[in-house]
């Protein structure tokens, strides 16, 4: 996608293969390997280290620093074959929905606007939007906390 001034915006999305939850989406003009490492480190602290990371062959993922760091924390790297998007169909499906439901519908004026609207979309995608592969449930529905009336004499 691009901002109104024609400058490109790159997206980095991290999706849980099992739950289909979008753990993070970052928007930036470019991505360097250190930015990928920062995001993965943040997610590993919050969610734990996964068994593997599956990605395309973008330079930000194939960088020696990223591969070495993942090996050191105990996560395997799985790269899809170039020209074989079906090897990570869940990610391709996600990217298509992301483009159709947000990126192709908006004219973005600033990178900050892209970042804010992307995070809003990600939260709706995870908590509200039904997913056919999950029996039309969202991957991370918001927790429902029932209101419990006070019981006389127990407060």
Regions found by a protein language model. Name each.
Residues 7-10, 25-47, 59:
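Active-site beta-loop-alpha junctions of metal-dependent nucleic acid enzymes
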Residues 73, 97-155:
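C-terminal domain-tail junction helix/linker
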Residues 1-7:
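Short, basic/aromatic recognition patches
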Residues 21-22:
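Hydrophobic "anchor" residues
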Residues 11-15:
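Surface-exposed coil/loop segments, especially low-complexity Tyr/Gly/Ser/Thr-rich stretches
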